[in-house]
Each structure stands twice: as C-alpha cells, then as structure tokens.
C-alpha cells in the first residue's frame, strides 16, 4: 500500500467526515482517477517529435498513452481524419496514488514561482490544471527534450462540490492559493 493511500484510509477519511458531517462512510469523497492529456497537434506533422512526446508521457505516468485521433478532416488546419493529434493516460489504483504523491511532493515544488494552484474546480467534484512545461518532472531526460510541451491534469473525485474536492486534494498534499 502506498504512503498516500495509507494516509487517506487512516487520517484523511476521518478528517473529511468530521469537517463535512457525513452520516454514512460511503459519502466521504474518494479520488477515482487522474487523467493526464497532451495536445500534440503541432507535433503531429513530425513523427519523431510526436513519438518523443509519447515517450515522455509514458515515462511521467508509468503506462502507455492512448493516442487521440482526429474525428474528421479540416483543410484549414491541414488535419486528416484518423491523424494523431493528442495523447492521454488514465491512472487508477496504485499508479494513481503514486503519481499524486510524486506530483505533490516532487513536481509542484519544481514549478518556477510556485505559490499554489487556483482552487476553482468544475463544480461537480473534479479539479483540472494545466502545466506549461513537461521538464518539471524528474522522469524526463532534459537532454532528449526537443520542444517544451504542456499538459492538462484532471483529478476526478466522488465529491459533490468544489469545496469538498479541494479539501480532499489539499489533505492529500496538493497546495492551493490562499484566499485573500
């Protein structure tokens, strides 16, 4: 069992139940999955660059990414139907907790001028953020990076509100900006 999963089962669940007054333990929010996605439309023209970004996403997540393909052709964007335009990885279970632990304690402190993430969610218990650079991850070999590439990370929880979601993620180690 990972350190973060153990922390969740032993401490975070109790804290959330006390704070929000849940009458049933099944109401306590749980982290369901983490989705990491990259839009690689510019890299789609260069197969070597596209493959390099796929390899980086694979190293960051620990599993093979799914290539997202264009649904239809758009001549103005020089896009063909079925052409790879992005990649995504869905993390669940042990890998999800390992990624969350690494992201909170190793990756986010490496972000330049980091003062915390925005605490605004989607209103339904999910939280998303965008990163500008993949080089903040220690798994990425800086000598092999051909071009900086951003990514989106989405945490999907069973929380009903943004407050519950951000409280859960904050207790797990994600740092948010303080309201002023």
Curated annotation (Swiss-Prot):
Keywords: Ribonucleoprotein, Ribosomal protein, RNA-binding, rRNA-binding, tRNA-binding. Transmembrane segments: none annotated. GO terms for biological process: translation. It comes from the Bacteria. InterPro entries: Ribosomal_uL5, Ribosomal_uL5_bac-type, Ribosomal_uL5_C, Ribosomal_uL5_CS, Ribosomal_uL5_dom_sf, Ribosomal_uL5_N. GO terms for molecular function: rRNA binding; structural constituent of ribosome; tRNA binding. GO terms for cellular component: ribonucleoprotein complex; ribosome. Belongs to the universal ribosomal protein uL5 family. PANTHER family: 60S RIBOSOMAL PROTEIN L11-RELATED. Part of the 50S ribosomal subunit; part of the 5S rRNA/L5/L18/L25 subcomplex. Contacts the 5S rRNA and the P site tRNA. Forms a bridge to the 30S subunit in the 70S ribosome. This is one of the proteins that bind and probably mediate the attachment of the 5S RNA into the large ribosomal subunit, where it forms part of the central protuberance. In the 70S ribosome it contacts protein S13 of the 30S subunit (bridge B1b), connecting the 2 subunits; this bridge is implicated in subunit movement. Contacts the P site tRNA; the 5S rRNA and some of its associated proteins might help stabilize positioning of ribosome-bound tRNAs. This is Large ribosomal subunit protein uL5.
